[in-house]
Amino acid sequence: MLESEFQREHAFESATEQELTCPISDNLHESVEADDDSVQMLDNLTLNTNPAESCESEEIQTKALPSSSSGQDLVASDEDSEDVELGDTFYSCSELLQRNCCVLPYKAQKKTKENPFDFDVRTWSSPCDFPRFGEMILLSPVLNPMPFFSCCTKRAIFCSSPGSSHGGSTPRSPFSPSSPRERHNKGLADSRFQRPLPNSSALDPSSPGSMLHGGHKSHEAFQMKQGRFDLQAAKISELMKSNNLDNAPTQSLLSIVNGILDETIERKNGELPQRVACLLRKVVQEIERRISTQSEHLRTQNSVFKAREEKYQSRIKVLETLASGTSEENETEKSKLEEKKKDKEEDMVGIEKENGHYNLEISTLRRELETTKKAYEQQCLQMESKTKGATAGIEDRVKELEQMRKDASVARKALEERVRELEKMGKEADAVKMNLEEKVKELQKYKDETITVTTSIEGKNRELEQFKQETMTVTTSLEAQNRELEQAIKETMTVNTSLEAKNRELEQSKKETMTVNTSLKAKNRELEQNLVHWKSKAKEMEEKSELKNRSWSQKELSYRSFISFQCQALQELRFYSKSIKQEILKVQDKYTVEFSQLGKKLLELGDAAANYHEVLTENQKLFNELQELKGNIRVYCRVRPFLRGQGASKTVVEHIGDHGELVVLNPTKPGKDAHRKFRFNKVYSPASTQAEVFSDIKPLIRSVLDGYNVCIFAYGQTGSGKTYTMTGPDGASEEEWGVNYRALNDLFRISQSRKSNIAYEVGVQMVEIYNEQVRDLLSGILSTTQQNGLAVPDASMYPVTSTSDVLELMSIGLQNRVVSSTALNERSSRSHSIVTVHVRGKDLKTGSALYGNLHLVDLAGSERVDRSEVTGDRLKEAQHINKSLSALGDVIFSLASKSSHVPYRNSKLTQLLQSSLGGRAKTLMFVQLNPDITSYSESMSTLKFAERVSGVELGAAKSSKDGRDVRELMEQDTIARKDDEIERLHLLKDINYPQRLQKKSLGQSDDFNSEAGDSQLSIEDDSRFQHDYTRQSRHSVTDGEALASSTDAEYDDETEGSTDAPCAAEGRKPLKISDKPKPVTPRSNTTTSRPLDKLKQVTMRTTNIAKATSALLSPSSQGMKKTGSASNFLKSPKDSKRWS
């Protein structure tokens, strides 16, 4: 982009250079000696054009005219050119186009005796075949009817077309870039051969320097008669009527003025004819007009230079920014270099030093630009000061009659000096412009060097040395130009002396003195009139001063009367102030009483305001308690911060309130319809930390130690930060820990603080659901789904006692978890992760036991296949993930609408979450939100799902705490049941049943009598077995069925899929479990109960347990099979740890 900009700028500069450069052939001055004949010949050949001609030449040049085959070098060898005399006219292309001349290019060849001018003539078919502007064109004196000028020389003149060569050097067109030395030589040649000649040959009709170029008829105005000019009136009037002076070069106009001055000097009377005087005045006006146009041209050139300087400064800034780089790019590059390129730090230090060196060179270049700018501005100021000083001097000197002649001569000198100075300034501006262009090229080279600095350091050093050499050559060229300018100034001084002598003679004319005298008389009259006018004004001022004195005296009297009136008013005010003070004292007494009353009221209001926050917190607690009683799922929303490189301004989150309000903006809808408001239990901003998030869920996690079941799961689209919230980043520090680590750490800390009263045991399980398969992440068992049912892994449970144990287990589980990269997330979780924490506590004083479970679920993110760009296995994973999440949505919808049927069996995820979503558990859901605009549709679906979840009522949570009275009731119930059985058997014996039944009943009675004989031992064994059985069932991982707390649901003899008790005892692999739904014992929706009702419930429960235990211990039930939930006994591999 920068290269294209530099190219456009270079093209613009070349165009402006073509506008400002006079088209002069470079090869004309190479073979010319400094004698009078060659000087006259070069003056004849040099094309001096005015601004109008330069504009026309620009039109011709911009057409990009191709050079024809006839545009070859006009070369005459040195041997043949000694006797050749060319009498042809040289014109510029603009003049030829103005006159519609037939242009015939000639190619000089060897001469013959018959035809000394033997030329190869070829014609151009159209003006488009002309050679480039600035080349010399030979016109035939026969075919060209226009007047022509002869040129005689004994040396060969080389007029080359672009691309030709002469003398071992490559000629170039006037617009081709040249070296500083070539421009130096060109400036010397221009300053040497374009000066006016002091002799009378300047007025020679054969020289174009004294005539108007382009075929004007001004050369016919003078005719040589007896060594002087005879001015013809007809020719002068023809020149006055035509516009020939407008197109004439400045040198020709000056030559006309010099000729007229010489003619007046030669005449005796010193008078000028009226027509000649008019012509002279018109020529002077034309010169003044050109001076003004040249000054305007310099102003425009100055503005162009200023614009270019601003562009150069902007480019330098761009180069500096490219060298330094933005802060964000530096940060990203540093992070990459620290990981991948640690070995290259030393090289980077060297590169930074070189960048500093380059920055210093950029600053030096900028200083040079500023110095050149200041020098140019000083030159412009000097020129303007000179012009102002000259005009001021003319106005001052006109006032004095005696110095009028000297002033006129000085004015004439100033005019001529201005013309020369303007021409010099134009040349100097061209030189400065070329220097600036060279510096721009050097800056462009420097830009290329900075881009390739990392690859070629040595090449850059060489280029820098070349750059220094070029700057030295530029400085030498500038010094040479300054010397040339000094020489040109000396030459102009010599010319000025000759012109001053002529002007002194001209100033002796009588007409000018008469005009000066008349002007002085007129000014004297004006001065006298001014004196009379000022005297009258002085009288008027005296009258006005008298009137003002009278008015001031009247004002003084009025002020005195006003002061006396004010004194009387002050006395009255003093009297009024005393009365007001008395009234104020009375009012103050009243106000003190009222203020005391207001103070008491303010104290009451202050107390109320102080208690306001306490009331708010109490209301919030009551609201939370109400939510717990209702059993609503708590919903916490967390907004993910933007990643590096993402625009924070393009967010869908409009507002985050302090009380759970969230306003989302739809970027596709304007106005009020674009805003959508949601309300949750808590909303976390992107700036929230992990500690702030965990502080709000601490009470929920601590309730696990009180015997409650708690479930926390994270929901959201892929890449929204679910794993970060639940687990934290890879290699996280203690500050970056997620909910999993912090929850277990908090449980350990509280268990240690309560160890004097309650003894806790904590176990951890970690499984995942991958493609509808339940896999154990801690043991490495990967089971597959069979055709006839679901294969449940032996989920191993490890006891943990410290945070280090948890970190070790979590690292193993995260390594085994399925993670892959997609287009939306570099580390996308491809499975649902479930961390289950089992807590068992025993009260050391009362002996009561409590059980609590904590499920920490990290759901896989929902994703769109077209955005994630997944194929193959990743596509299959995404389909299973979306299917399970849609099943979760169906379950939430059924629970929200309180439907009679809840489809838990549609997915393994909903089966595992059944105890948390459909049971008496405390459930919390983290909603992770991606604030990017591109994820607006996924964010809205996530928020709508969370809003639906917040309305689900699960009922009040219930603690699974068993006291000592419950165990005593169970023992009493078993004793009473056995007594009833004995009495029943005795009754059957008395009724005289058949012998078969009698024997069977007697066998049973003998067994029961033996059991009754050792009743205390059997009761203890039953209670211990029941205790261990319920413990194992609570710590098992189900295959989708509810973790029911009732024993009736755990012991169902009529289930289809079952596991043999011997298999469970020996640790063999379990059989398949049917996928058919099993009945779950319905729960009561009552939140509170009386003690009597509670006792009845406990007795009914104990009777059911006693029946189950008796059935298990009876001899006829030895072959009986246990229910499917019994297959979930924790049987880990041999190397896994076990609870005793």
From Swiss-Prot:
Binding residues for ATP: 716-723
Residue segments, region Disordered: 1-37, 50-81, 161-217, 323-347, 1002-1021, 1028-1140
Molecular function GO labels: ATP binding; microtubule binding; microtubule motor activity
Pfam families listed in its UniProt record: Kinesin
Gene3D superfamilies cross-referenced by the UniProt entry: 1.20.5.170, Kinesin motor domain
A GO-annotated cellular component: microtubule
Xref: PROSITE patterns: KINESIN_MOTOR_2
Biased composition, class Polar residues, residue ranges: 197-209, 1002-1018, 1099-1130
Entries under InterPro entries matching the protein: Kinesin-like_fam, Kinesin_motor_dom, Kinesin_motor_dom_sf, P-loop_NTPase
Coiled-coil residue windows: 327-546
Bias kind Low complexity: ranges: 161-179
UniProtKB keywords: ATP-binding, Coiled coil, Microtubule, Motor protein, Nucleotide-binding
Keyword Coiled coil: yes
Basic and acidic residues bias spans: 1-12, 180-193, 332-347, 1066-1078
GO BP terms: microtubule-based movement; microtubule-based process
Domain Kinesin motor: 632-952
Family: Belongs to the TRAFAC class myosin-kinesin ATPase superfamily. Kinesin family. KIN-14 subfamily.
PANTHER family in the cross-refs: KINESIN-LIKE PROTEIN KIN-14O, KINESIN-LIKE PROTEIN KLP-3
This protein's name: Kinesin-like protein KIN-14O
